[in-house]
A protein has these predicted regions:
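A ligand-binding cleft/hinge motif common to bilobed small-molecule-binding domains
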Residues: 75-78, 90-100, 146-149, 174-205
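Short helices/loops that flank or line small-molecule/ion binding pockets
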Residues: 60-61, 70, 74-87, 101-103, ...
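Short helix-initiation/N-cap motifs at beta->coil->alpha
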Residues: 52, 67-78, 122-123, 141, ...
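Extracytoplasmic small-molecule ligand-binding "clamshell" domains
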Residues: 24-91, 100
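Ligand-binding cleft/hinge of the Venus flytrap
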Residues: 38-42, 55-63, 127, 140-161, ...
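Extended ligand-binding regions for polar small-molecule ligands
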Residues: 52-61, 121, 128-129, 134, ...
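Periplasmic-binding protein-like
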Residues: 32, 110-117, 180, 184, ...
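A conserved helix-loop-strand patch within extracytoplasmic ligand-binding domains
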Residues: 64, 92-94, 106-155
Length: 226
C-alpha cells in the first residue's frame, strides 16, 4: 500500500471511530426475561427480542448508542425517576397510573390482556369466572392491576411471567391475566409442552405499549418519536 492510500485508510478509520465515539449513550432499562419482547439469547449471550431490535434502531437513528440495563419490571419507573436510566423499554403498557409518574413516547405496539388457565380446569372461560379465585401475576404488570379489580380475587405476585406460569402449572394458583402476545408466544415454545396450560380465547382489555421517559424530558421524547 502506497503512502497516499495508507493516509486515506487511516483518515477513514479515524472518521469511523470518531462517529462511534460521538454517539451519546442511551441507558435503556428493560426487564430482559419477557419473550418475545426482550430476553437473553443463550447462544450469543446478547439481549434480543422485538423491543431490543426496535430501540436499537430508534436510538441509532436519533444519534444514540443504546446500553441495555437489565432490571425487574417493578424497578423500571423508579429507575427512571431517580435518573439511573434514560428510557424504559419493556413492553410497557401506557396506563394512567404510569403516566402520572413518567411520560411516554407515541405508542409503538397494539397489545391486550388475556387469561391463562390450566387445561384440566374447564371452569374458567372468561373474566367473570375469575371472581373469588386465587390468581397469580407478575409484579408491577398491567395484568396485576386488572386482576386487583376483580371481585373477591386473591392475588400473589411473582418477579416474572415465567414464575407465574410455573406457579399456575403447579396448581398453586387458578389463573393469570397477562399480555396476550406473551401468552401466545409461550405456548408456541417447546418448553410449554411440559406445562398443562391454555389460553382462554378473547382479549380482556386492549392496550398500547410505549417507551417511558422521565417527566418533562420533551427533548428526548421528540428525538425518539421521530
Amino acid at each position: 500500500m502506497n503512502m497516499k492510500k495508507l493516509v486515506a485508510a487511516a483518515a477513514l478509520a479515524l472518521m469511523v471511530v470518531g462517529t462511534q465515539a460521538g454517539a451519546e449513550t442511551l441507558r435503556v432499562g428493560s426487564e430482559t426475561v419477557y419473550p418475545p419482547f426482550e430476553f437473553l439469547d443463550s447462544n450469543s449471550g446478547k439481549y434480543v427480542g422485538f423491543d431490543i431490535d426496535l430501540i436499537d434502531e430508534v436510538a441509532k437513528r436519533a444519534g444514540f448508542e443504546p446500553q441495555i440495563l437489565s432490571m425487574g419490571l417493578d424497578g423500571l419507573i423508579p429507575a427512571l425517576m431517580s435518573g439511573s436510566i434514560d428510557v424504559a423499554v419493556s413492553a410497557l403498557t401506557i396506563t394512567p397510573e404510569r403516566a402520572a409518574k413518567v411520560d411516554f413516547t407515541k405508542p409503538y405496539y397494539e397489545s391486550g390482556l388475556s387469561i391463562m388457565a390450566r387445561k384440566d380446569d374447564a371452569s374458567i372461560k372468561g373474566v367473570k369466572d375469575l371472581e373469588n379465585k386465587v390468581l397469580c401475576a407478575e409484579i408491577g404488570s398491567s395484568g396485576s392491576v386488572f386482576m386487583s379489580k376483580i371481585k373477591g380475587a386473591k392475588i400473589r405476585t411473582f418477579n416474572s411471567a415465567g414464575e407465574a406460569f410455573l406457579e399456575l402449572n403447579n396448581k398453586g394458583r387458578e389463573a393469570i391475566v397477562n399480555d396476550k402476545p406473551v401468552n401466545e408466544y409461550f405456548l408456541t415454545q417447546k418448553a410449554s409442552a411440559n406445562f398443562n396450560l391454555r389460553e382462554v380465547p378473547g382479549v380482556l382489555k386492549a392496550e398500547n405499549y410505549g417507551f417511558a421517559i422521565r417527566k418533562g424530558d420533551d427533548k428526548l421524547r421528540a428525538r425518539l418519536d421521530k
